Amino acid sequence: MNLSRRLPKTLAVTVPLAAILATAACGSGIEENTASATPVATAAVAAQAPADQAAKGTVASNRLTVATAGKAAQAALAKCQADGLGFVTVSVVDRAGNVQAMLRGDNAAQHTVEASRQKGYTAAAFGANTSDLAGRAKGDGATVADLEGTLFLPGGVAVKAGNASIAGIGVGGAPDGMADQACAAAGLDAIAGSLQ
């Protein structure tokens, strides 16, 4: 989907810049990953970067370890199975929406795979549970629901280290989104002691 056709020109530029700024604000240590900085930020934004990052030309970002992501996925699926909802899919994604762990329950339909990933990404990107974000996706004209890869339905939980959103746990497939949400929350509870 080409957002520049659907959003006013200033918003089409502001949304990617806001995403860059939000990503730069991530901080505190789960697993450190560095990547080359994209030359999109303005000089004013670059001037605000810590001196050590500016000298390196890279920024650090945190993500869950594979063991922690797997533990969250297993706990979320176990909760759904205990509730008689073993036909869901659980996805644990990093802040960029990259899948770190995924478990597909027995008889989970194909659409649950993408729904769980999108819910996890939406929670991670916005730093909030998707059940709390659903109201932002309503209205006339362009809304955040038009952002590609997002899904503003209950079932996504943000994973935070300190105040920084570093991942999301998404569950898709239960007949009620709040049941998906409860399973995702169980995944977060299982790893809460591992987050710094």
Which residue ranges define each predicted feature?
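Hydrophobic helical h-region of N-terminal Sec-dependent signal peptides
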Residues: 13-20
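C-terminal motif of bacterial Sec signal peptides marking the signal peptidase cleavage site
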Residues: 21-25
